[in-house]
Amino acid sequence: LIVGSDTYPPYIYLNNDGVPAGIDVEIATEAFRRMGYAARFETIDWEQKTNLVESGAIDCIWGCFSMDGREEVYRWAGPYMVSRQVAAVDADSSIRTLGDLAGKTIAVQSTGKPEEIFLSGSDPRIPQTVEVLSIENRSVQYALLSCGYVDAIAAHETGILQYMKDNSVEFRILEEPLLVTGLGIAFAKNDTRGLDS
């Protein structure tokens, strides 16, 4: 089965040998093995994930993928894990709460849950004056924060912690999460193979 994913350490990334590795790779490999399948991982254009799974170019989307708000878009297996979507700032920043983001700039991954949360304007904790910078390549948002080009970033907490560890960078994660979400495996709505069960 072809598993489509973006790189998102520690969930899925290429190890030093260029081979997919990470939490999701281990879980997917074992789950599909138990079902009698071998998993083959392909890095995809994350913005095209729905088109790729619906067209059959990939069998599923698996890679730290939040189920919340997408229940009707895909056929889901999961959740297999719970994750916190959070905002992070420079360690010395005066920003302490989501409300402190008023008039500030935050970088998020395009098509991700944080982008949806910030752009929807539906969360009363988030000021309407936050400027949202949507980035296709997730790793760029970390660099933007490190260099001071943005005031904050938002992503899965585990991903932020992994980036800090791998790059010896000190960010401060805000205490209040944007969202606590279940992570799942997304199949096309018209997929009738029963792989989601």
Give each language-model segment a name.
Residues 6-7, 81-89, 157, 161, ...:
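Periplasmic-binding protein-like
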Residues 9-15, 70, 96-97, 116, ...:
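Short, solvent-exposed loop/turn elements at domain surfaces
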Residues 18-26, 43-44, 108-112, 135-139, ...:
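Soluble non-cytosolic domains of exported or imported proteins
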Residues 13-17, 28-38, 77, 113-135, ...:
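Ligand-binding cleft/hinge of the Venus flytrap
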Residues 1-65, 72, 132-135:
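Extracytoplasmic small-molecule ligand-binding "clamshell" domains
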Residues 1-6, 88, 105-109, 153, ...:
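Short, well-ordered beta-strand segments
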